[in-house]
């Protein structure tokens, strides 16, 4: 709603960047719609505030595991995360059409877990990073390092990227 956009604009006005890791909660029955409404409000609020830099932390589901095949569309993708992952993919598709913001979309690796902050990670783009035959992983602390690094030294403006240790 217009009021929702104004509230978000007021919250971020005067800041250099907005980082969104919005998720209404994996157990929310209408996660798909809630995710998209929330993401749209964050994008619109960021624009209304005049903040140009937006970094969205999305999901791994939209990473390409083969030409034309995204992880969320594979039979192995967990059913309990599917609606949220489909919404995150839809949000990425919206953001890709956004030309007034200096946006970046960060897809975490397939495995995101607790762990130590090492400050070390590898960068990827449209495909998940792997450790041999195993899916790549990263600690939440190192994912935060990657977010701050991208904000301080932008390398993926109007692009999606992924990371893993």
How would you label these PLM feature ranges?
Residues 3-5:
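Short, small-residue-biased leader/transition segments that mark boundaries at the very start
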Residues 98-99, 113-121, 150-159:
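Glycine/proline-rich active-site loop of Rossmann-fold NAD(P)-dependent oxidoreductases
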Residues 15:
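An anion/phosphate-binding loop that grips the pyrophosphate of nucleotide cofactors and donors
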Residues 27, 61-66, 111-115:
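Conserved catalytic-site region of short-chain dehydrogenase/reductase
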Residues 20, 26-54, 86, 90:
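NAD(P)-cofactor binding segment of oxidoreductase domains
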Residues 93-114:
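Conserved beta-loop-beta element that borders a ligand/cofactor-binding pocket
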Residues 70-98, 129-130:
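Catalytic helix-loop patch of NAD(P)-dependent Rossmann-fold dehydrogenases
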Residues 51-52, 126, 130-165:
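Mid/C-terminal beta-alpha module of Rossmann-like enzyme folds, strongest
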